Amino acid sequence: MKYMRHFLDFYHHKNTSEIMLLVFCAAVPGICTEIYYFGFGVLFQILLSVFFSVSFEFLVKRLRKQTVKSLFSDNSAAVTGVLIGISLPSLSPWWLSFFGAFFSIVIAKQIYGGLGNNIFNPAMTGYSILLVSFPILMTNWSFQNSSYFNLFDLNNTFSVIFCTDINHYYSLIDEFQMMYKFITQATPLEQIRTHVLDFNNKIDNIFEFVNYNYYFKNWKWISINISFLIGGIVLLGFNVICWRIPVSILFSLYVFFALDYYFFKKSMYYPIMQLFFGSTMFSVFFIATDPVTTSITKIGRIVFGCIVGFLIWLIRSFGNYPDAIAFSILLSNSIVPLIDHYTQPRVYGYVKKK
């Protein structure tokens, strides 16, 4: 007799360590692209976040008198650190990685019982707390005009990240920008939103600004998103993630902004822009697809993705956080039990009454 695989078994036929390793490998194209544009600070942030995440995981397991063997066998803490490091601006001070790892591992993961028991995505929990607590530090991204890096650049990056005095930190940032022609800026969505909210701008000037930013000025963000899209396709190819979540998020996000742009004329952004700016592709493929914090049913995952897409549109259009992805995912995580309750498949062996 031929047996069919269950939906959940199909996407969990690999062990946790293999899944985490594939997630890291799939993120490599995006990481390399960020290093190309943002400098070696990206690598520092990832290494720091991994170190702090693994350290906090080790300490909590020791305090709870649990075996630390799983710490090095499932690699979940290390991957959480990688995701936090990718989310942080490249020249962020080292203590942002420290606090991000603390809130992600200790608060969002271990307090709920560890791997497999957390309600909210750990990496996005830590990131969201940092974003609310330190909005200026978390929204300054430094592009380097030159793609050539040498040891002197590495040393200066190190001195900025590990600076202990916040005033000296900002002075080093200014000096670093002048010396290496760095451009410190907010993300494109934040820039455009600020320009739109400037009521002194006429509507034609706003559209001109949006078009210029989309086609010419911020192609670097587009290439970063494309790199993470490639990594997401790799994860889909190896059946590490389910296609229903990323497809439903991207589809619903595009539909809501297309309606807003073409029919209601309320949005100043091209709908396709929403898919390739900010952390959209990174979050859609590497954050929202976390199997622990998403729905376990086929229909539920589609519903979950559509809710995430709707919340992204809602917050980007009417909220104060233009990227909005972290908050959208966390809010959607909170209603996953409700989604699962109403999307449960029919029990095996149950015969529908005629």
From Swiss-Prot:
Q: Which residues cross the membrane?
A: 19-39, 40-60, 77-99, 119-139, 221-241, 245-265, 268-288, 295-315, 319-339
| Entry keyword annotation includes Transmembrane | yes
Task: Supply the alphabetized keyword list.
Answer: Cell inner membrane, Cell membrane, Electron transport, Flavoprotein, FMN, Membrane, Phosphoprotein, Translocase, Transmembrane, Transmembrane helix, Transport
The UniProt entry, under Pfam families, shows:
NQR2_RnfD_RnfE
Signal peptide positions on this chain: none
According to the UniProt entry, which residues carry FMN phosphoryl threonine? 187
Question: What is the membrane topology here?
Answer: Multi-pass membrane protein
Q: Where in the cell is it found?
A: Cell inner membrane
Keyword Aminoacyl-tRNA synthetase part of the UniProt annotation:
no
Q: Which InterPro entries does this UniProt record tie to the protein?
A: NqrB/RnfD, RnfD_bac
Q: Which GO terms describe its biological process?
A: electron transport chain; transmembrane transport
Q: What is its EC number?
A: 7.-.-.-
One term under GO cellular component = plasma membrane
The cofactor(s) it depends on are: FMN
Share what the entry says about its subunit structure, partners included.
The complex is composed of six subunits: RnfA, RnfB, RnfC, RnfD, RnfE and RnfG.
| Function according to Swiss-Prot or TrEMBL | Part of a membrane-bound complex that couples electron transfer with translocation of ions across the membrane.
Protein family membership = Belongs to the NqrB/RnfD family.
Q: What is this protein called?
A: Ion-translocating oxidoreductase complex subunit D
Q: Which organism is it from?
A: Buchnera aphidicola subsp. Baizongia pistaciae (strain Bp)
